[in-house]
Every structure is written in C-alpha cells, then in structure tokens.
Amino acid sequence: MIEFVNAKLNIGLSVVRRRSDGYHDLETLFYPVGRFNGTPENPTPFCDILEITVNHSGGGDDFQFLGRHIDCPPEKNLVVRAVNAFRGECVARDVAMPDMKLTLEKHLPDGAGLGGGSADAAFTLNMLNRLTGRRLEKEALSGIALSLGADCPFFLENRPLFAGGVGERFEEVSLKLDGWWALIVKPEVYISTKEAFAGISPRAPRFDLRNLGKLPIEEWKEYVVNDFEASIFPAHPELGAIKEKLYDCGAVYASMSGSGSSIYGLYRDEETIRHAASMFDRGKYVCKL
C-alpha cells in the first residue's frame, strides 16, 4: 500500500489562552496542500511517499527512510512511534497485528510549520488500520494521533477544517480554494516551539475563522492574521521580508504557516505564481490548490 503524504497550511492562527496544563488553546484553519495522485516514478517534490506492507520475513517491523535526512533517533521518528502506538493499542485489545515493512521517502521540509512529520504519522495510522482490517475505531485513532502531536488528528481527516483547543477540536468550514495556487517559501531558519510561544500574549481572535469562506480572499490581508508573526518576525526579519516579497510579486494573501518558518502566498493564476517563484533562489514550492 502506497500513499502520497501531503502537508497543510494554517490560514490564520490565534493564540487564545494559556491553559492550566501549560499548553495553549488556539484557533486556526487547516488547509491541505500538496496532495498528489501520481506514481512513485513521477511524484511531486512537495509530498512524502509512504509505503507499508506486511513483513512476511519475520523479525519484527522493518523501517527504511529515504530522501531528506530526518535529524532524530529512529525511536523518536513519528512514523516509528505511530507504529508502536498502534501496535500497543492492538495488544491492549488482544488483537493480532503482523510485522510491518515501512518505507518513507521524505520530501516535505521539516521545521516548516507545514505538519510534515505529523502527516507521516497520521497517514501511517490510517494505512495500518486499513491493512489490519480496520481494527481500531475513529476515536481510538484520534486518541493515538493526539498523543503523537497536536497536528496529527487533522491529517486523519485531511480536509479544510476549523480547529480549536490545541488543534484537535474540529468544525466543518465552507472554504474551497480550487483553482488557486500557493507559493511556499522555506528559508534556512529553525524556530523552536519554545521560541515561538515565548513572545506570545494570548488574546481573543481578531476574526472568526469559521466564517472565512464568506470573506473575499482580497480582504484576508486585513482580517486574517497569524499571531506568531508579531513575535517571530522581529527576531527573524528575513521572514517578514519574504512575506512582503510575496505580496510584491502579486500574492493576494500571504502568511506564515503555523509557528514557521515557512511563508506562503496565494495566487490567482499559474503565470503570476511562476513569475513569483522565479524571484526566489531556493526552498520554494509551487502547489495548485
């Protein structure tokens, strides 16, 4: 079984309050980006390729990682953790699960605010569930996903959704960006979660993102903001410069995704976005929405 693993964009992100457990309640709109329906021989560069099969040779689960280097010990890789968590739930239910062989070809950038690692984990959970005859119900999968990361539950759904809480409480939204293009720029900047939240002052959202589909995209620049930009851009001015450059190159809306460091711009047509992409030397990805 092979899946092409897409990323996500945050359209608007408000840090609403700090919780008693030390986490923060957020409000954001997740939008999938980079989905691909091609073949392994001709993939888009903006997706990961995940293959999972039953390992008939025995000897336990077998993992192979290709493509971009993942800078963490294997046992901390989210795909490995997803398999172990899924197997643990099966053991707890006295459900048999065969050994698996997993190959992850990594293309999505990490540390980008695009949810690449979370997407890999969520796709792993969904694929394992299908391969084992859908042994786990949706609630169980969601619980495992949340234990792996706040973005993981979204990728189980993988469609435009409003998210609250730490990012796990979803509401349907009416938003379609069919025909639009996204230019995503990922500079060589790493922003830790600690740094991202250090300069944040929680506040009420400026705009209710549940109503984003009713607001013309031409007006998003005025109302739809990512709260992290206010604290991160002064510390990393090159990120703010990228956002302004996207606007200068014709973007109708531009924003940082998540806590960065990717900056994206939305464009109406292919000609404009191709020209915009030519203005950046590296770390750029053009995606049709």
Locations of the language-model features?
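A short, flexible low-complexity segment enriched in Lys/Arg and Gly/Pro that occurs
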Residues: 80-99, 126, 222-242
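Residue-level signal for inorganic ion chemistry
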Residues: 11, 50, 79, 117, ...
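ATP-binding N-lobe of GHMP and related small-molecule kinases
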Residues: 1-112, 130-139, 174-176, 186
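Glycine/serine-rich anion-binding loops at beta->alpha junctions
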Residues: 103-132, 150, 252-267
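Short, basic/glycine-rich phosphate-binding loops at helix/coil junctions
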Residues: 57-72, 124, 146, 216-225
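Generic non-transmembrane alpha-helical segments
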Residues: 82-92, 140, 144-147, 241, ...
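Conserved, helical-rich catalytic subdomain that frames metal- and/or nucleotide-binding sites
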Residues: 156-253, 268-282, 286-289
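Contiguous, small/hydrophobic- and glycine-enriched helical/loop subdomains that border
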Residues: 121, 125-162
